[in-house]
Amino acid sequence: MTVKTTVSTKDIDEAFLRLKDIVKETPLQLDHYLSQKYDCKVYLKREDLQWVRSFKLRGAYNAISVLSDEAKSKGITCASAGNHAQGVAYTAKKLNLNAVIFMPVTTPLQKVNQVKFFGNSNVEVVLTGDTFDHCLAEALTYTSEHQMNFIDPFNNVHTISGQGTLAKEMLEQSKTDNVNFDYLFAAIGGGGLISGISTYFKTYSPTTKIIGVEPSGASSMYESVVVNNQVVTLPNIDKFVDGASVARVGDITFEIAKENVDDYVQVDEGAVCSTILDMYSKQAIVAEPAGALSVSALENYKDHIKGKTVVCVISGGNNDINRMKEIEERSLLYEEMKHYFILNFPQRPGALREFVNDVLGPQDDITKFEYLKKSSQNTGTVIIGIQLKDHDDLIQLKQRVNHFDPSNIYINENKMLYSLLI
């Protein structure tokens, strides 16, 4: 049997009909804060408000619903860092199918619990592997051994067609408001979302520039399309943006992206964290790291989008509240507002007061101080964290620290040491 490897607008239109009573029509909102910040019109497609809080339900339901009754009776499997798993679980419950869902051990607990909630007794969750790619290998082996049906999170034309319904929905909404998009920003993990969206836009909104956004620590599509002109597997990836941390994109999504995507942006994970905090405080939007990628990329494109009309897909809002401390720390590090040092303190009364008076600036704040006094030594080792009001104060701070202790270690520049603090 020949496996279909292309996606058409007809496929997306058919998927749209399958999904119209299943998925929520999520809002397309003009965002006044971002529009003012970037001197353009910025619209947000709020897939974080979908039933499973991400766009993944679209692709999962479409891919499962086209299976034959015989195939459905054998059960389904999937591998996912979280959102695709929730879409599969929701669908399994809706269609009363048995599903075995494989998730990386590193998946945030919030996403694991949501999968169990949406799937209930129809779903078994298996945590395995440190990355999506390791998890995928386990899932494929299990699927083959048990003769079940694997629902690919991105490298499947039915999954891609389902994700593409987001574009059809978006363009219908924009037509109602008489809006034409100059730029569209969307996250790339394995490439299913950007493939579906770009397929529809290239036919029905061909002047819109399609910009794919990846975390800088997992830019597998950029490395494949732009650097190597073939699908490559990244040897190492940063897993922080878990919803978009994929070492190898799909063969199908690679071909579609190569044809349709106009440009790629790699966003530092720290910048994503700053965006998450900004969206929460300014817009009351709870975005997960992958969901914030599209908005983060606007900073890279600020000169291009001035005076234009832009849409960003907020692809997901499944953020674990327990990660907020790390998100804040990564943001402060990226913004050069928080700094850690290892110092040798003289073991005598008044040494700390001397440090405060001689080293700290008038607006600097000590956020961490760890010190263990050793009576057998003249000095003791101190780990100290200092938060600045203005990152431009860093140069003078480091000069004062060096004067206080020339042998100090600046932890921010040592990734291994810094990882012990957050």
UniProtKB/Swiss-Prot annotation:
InterPro entries: ACT-like_dom_sf (IPR045865), IlvA (IPR011820), Ser/Thr_Dehydratase (IPR050147), Ser/Thr_deHydtase_PyrdxlP-BS (IPR000634), TD_ACT-like (IPR001721), TD_ACT-like_sf (IPR038110), TrpB-like_PALP (IPR001926), TrpB-like_PALP_sf (IPR036052). Pathway: Amino-acid biosynthesis; L-isoleucine biosynthesis; 2-oxobutanoate from L-threonine: step 1/1. Its EC number is 4.3.1.19. It catalyses: L-threonine = 2-oxobutanoate + NH4(+). Pyridoxal 5'-phosphate binds at N83, G189, G190, G191, G192, L193, S315. It is an enzyme of class 4 (lyase). The modification N6-(pyridoxal phosphate)lysine is found at K56. Residues 339-413 form the ACT-like domain. Pfam families: PALP, Thr_dehydrat_C. Gene3D superfamilies: 3.40.50.1100, Biosynthetic Threonine Deaminase, Domain 3. Its cofactor is pyridoxal 5'-phosphate. Keywords: Amino-acid biosynthesis, Branched-chain amino acid biosynthesis, Isoleucine biosynthesis, Lyase, Pyridoxal phosphate. One of its GO terms (biological process) is threonine metabolic process. GO terms for molecular function: L-serine ammonia-lyase activity; pyridoxal phosphate binding; threonine deaminase activity. Catalyzes the anaerobic formation of alpha-ketobutyrate and ammonia from threonine in a two-step reaction. The first step involved a dehydration of threonine and a production of enamine intermediates (aminocrotonate), which tautomerizes to its imine form (iminobutyrate). Both intermediates are unstable and short-lived. The second step is the nonenzymatic hydrolysis of the enamine/imine intermediates to form 2-ketobutyrate and free ammonia. In the low water environment of the cell, the second step is accelerated by RidA. Homotetramer. Belongs to the serine/threonine dehydratase family. This is L-threonine dehydratase biosynthetic IlvA. The lineage of its organism: Bacteria, Bacillati, Bacillota, Bacilli, Bacillales.
